[in-house]
Amino acid sequence: LTDFRDASEEILPGDQVLLQRTRTGIEMLNRRYRPDGQDLFFLLHRPRRWNAGEGLWMGYERKRGKLTEFNALLRGGSRGCFSEIVGETAILPAIKYVITLDTDTQFPRDAARQLVGTMAHPLNRPQFDAQRGIVAEGYSILQPRVGVSLPSARRSWFVRLFAGDAGIEPYTREVSDVYQDEFHEGSFIGK
């Protein structure tokens, strides 16, 4: 899922070169790793749209917008919000779980298996209440605890002030989350 960076213009020099490079990379990965002829890698790119509040051309609602529009596509919605799609998308409606990674995400070995296993557990499976329009039981989003790595702990005054001590101290830093414990809900933390 990609957007171009925010800009004062809708189209910048170099946009198409970057998009073509990404397209070529995705196509190369699919040629190399395609089992049974099904694509494993996709590019879904959105164009910049004018945001009057920000006074910029940008991807609609940034990360939240990308995930919302991608989720709609997975559920059979329109492809119209994406200006460039690479990969055979027929498989997309069969996708059950989505794991989002950022450039600063640390994703240890077997973490995906553990996340999917947690979501697939019978007590965690979301039960949608169509009348109220909510997930009434279980969970539809799982977010591991957000932490600060040792290398980034001194990056800025903001990080030092709000992150506390960095590193691993499992016994002195273990805490519960009041919202999760009492209401079975959490505060989503994202970029």
Tell where the protein language model's regions lie, with residue ranges.
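Internal catalytic domains of large membrane-associated glycosyltransferases
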Residues: L1-K191
